[in-house]
């Protein structure tokens, strides 16, 4: 199994983990895990096109830069950027709590993003 497949599998597992965290009422944790699912999916897509970055911000930048060839819309890229910002707030912030509504939105965004990544990786093979 190559790195692309491993990253897609990891992304799918993280989506399932985020669902469990949501069901347990762990909304901040859910958002963080959902972001990491999107991150691994993004890395898989980029690797499929011979691109990579060592940082989260760099990965997001490359996703924006390569969005057309990856078959992503501006909205798809915005969801990844939003999830990254929320993950930072969830992990490090102390002033905001993540609501149930926001957590379910980020979780759904992650499910869609991971599926699009899976489709892009399969198309590129």
Swiss-Prot record:
Cleavable signal peptide: none
Residues annotated as transmembrane: none
Alphabetized Pfam families for the sequence: HEPN (PF05168)
The family this protein is said to belong to: Belongs to the UPF0332 family.
Name listed for the protein in its UniProt record: UPF0332 protein AF_0298
Organism expressing this protein natively: Archaeoglobus fulgidus (strain ATCC 49558 / DSM 4304 / JCM 9628 / NBRC 100126 / VC-16)
